[in-house]
């Protein structure tokens, strides 16, 4: 009986209307969902933190300034190592903004009873599609038709050329999906596991003193796994920008 009314682990990812407005004159309905709300909140937090840190910048750095500088240095190192020290500087603002946006949405999703926007493939696919499309346009802009040499492996036998070109083309197009799917799948699976474990632990611990003591074991695991999820939030943000820089480098150098 203690396992009745099991909560669906997918319920936390449901997109719901928080506010809606119907304009009957022009037959228009405007709504604000929890998905859009958390995107707006993350953007406001990012802008506010950066403005406050910049405004309060002093000769002796505080913890907030040191955190920002550490993130700045980490992203800058990724851009320089993945692209190059000369052309990489041009794309650093975009990569830095992309990292901060993904990281902030990942962290907001870790707050209990909040909404994780990066667990939705529609958002991560939109970002990954934009990145790959932009890298493709960049490659055509710099190399024109020579950009197609990216799909021709060096030293390829002539007989295998059509097959390998097709494989390279499919692999290139799959970047649109794989880049976003990797992020959303990792965030989604981690949040689902936390919900399942939390619901299971709560039902055990609320069944009596003996079960309460037993429930301390999975409760400790939940806290440990929450720390792991915090690390994953940072790691997945960095993996996303590393691959983004790699795609930009491929378009610039054709390899």
Curated annotation (Swiss-Prot):
It is found in: Mitochondrion inner membrane. Disulfide bonds: none annotated. It is a multi-pass membrane protein. The chain crosses the membrane at residues 35-55, 91-111, 120-140, 147-167, 177-197, 208-228. The keyword Transferase does not apply. GO terms for cellular component: mitochondrial inner membrane; proton-transporting ATP synthase complex. Residues 1-7 form a propeptide. GO terms for molecular function: proton-transporting ATP synthase activity, rotational mechanism. InterPro entries: ATP_synth_F0_asu, ATP_synth_F0_asu_AS, ATP_synth_F0_asu_bact/mt, F0_ATP_A_sf. The keyword ATP-binding does not apply. Keywords: ATP synthesis, CF(0), Hydrogen ion transport, Ion transport, Membrane, Mitochondrion, Mitochondrion inner membrane, Transmembrane, Transmembrane helix, Transport. CDD domains: ATP-synt_Fo_a_6 (cd00310). Belongs to the ATPase A chain family. F-type ATPases have 2 components, CF(1) - the catalytic core - and CF(0) - the membrane proton channel. CF(1) has five subunits: alpha(3), beta(3), gamma(1), delta(1), epsilon(1). CF(0) has three main subunits: a, b and c. Mitochondrial membrane ATP synthase (F(1)F(0) ATP synthase or Complex V) produces ATP from ADP in the presence of a proton gradient across the membrane which is generated by electron transport complexes of the respiratory chain. F-type ATPases consist of two structural domains, F(1) - containing the extramembraneous catalytic core and F(0) - containing the membrane proton channel, linked together by a central stalk and a peripheral stalk. During catalysis, ATP synthesis in the catalytic domain of F(1) is coupled via a rotary mechanism of the central stalk subunits to proton translocation. This is ATP synthase subunit a.
């Amino acid at each position: 009986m203690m396992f009745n009314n099991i909560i669906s682990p997918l319920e936390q990812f449901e997109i719901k209307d928080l506010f809606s407005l119907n304009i009957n004159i022009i037959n228009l309905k405007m709504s604000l969902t929890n998905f859009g709300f958390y995107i707006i909140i993350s953007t406001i937090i990012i802008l506010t933190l950066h403005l406050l840190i910049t405004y309060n910048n002093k000769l002796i750095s505080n913890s907030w300034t040191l955190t920002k500088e550490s993130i700045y240095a980490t992203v800058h190192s990724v851009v320089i190592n993945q692209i190059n020290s000369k052309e990489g500087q041009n794309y650093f603002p975009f990569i830095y903004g992309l990292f901060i946006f993904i990281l902030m949405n990942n962290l907001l999703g870790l707050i209990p009873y909040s909404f994780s926007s990066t667990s939705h493939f529609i958002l991560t696919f939109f970002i990954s599609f934009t990145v790959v499309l932009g890298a493709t346009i960049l490659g055509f802009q710099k190399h024109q038709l020579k950009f197609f040499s990216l799909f021709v492996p060096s030293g390829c036998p002539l007989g295998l050329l059509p097959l390998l070109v097709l494989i390279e083309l499919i692999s290139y197009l799959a970047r649109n999906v794989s880049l976003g799917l990797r992020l959303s799948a990792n965030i989604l699976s981690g949040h689902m596991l936390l919900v399942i474990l939390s619901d299971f632990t709560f039902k055990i611990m609320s069944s009596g003193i003996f079960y309460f003591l037993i429930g301390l074991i999975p409760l400790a695991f939940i806290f440990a796994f929450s720390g792991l999820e915090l690390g994953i939030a940072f790691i997945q943000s960095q993996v996303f920008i590393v691959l983004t820089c790699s795609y930009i480098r491929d378009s610039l150098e054709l390899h």
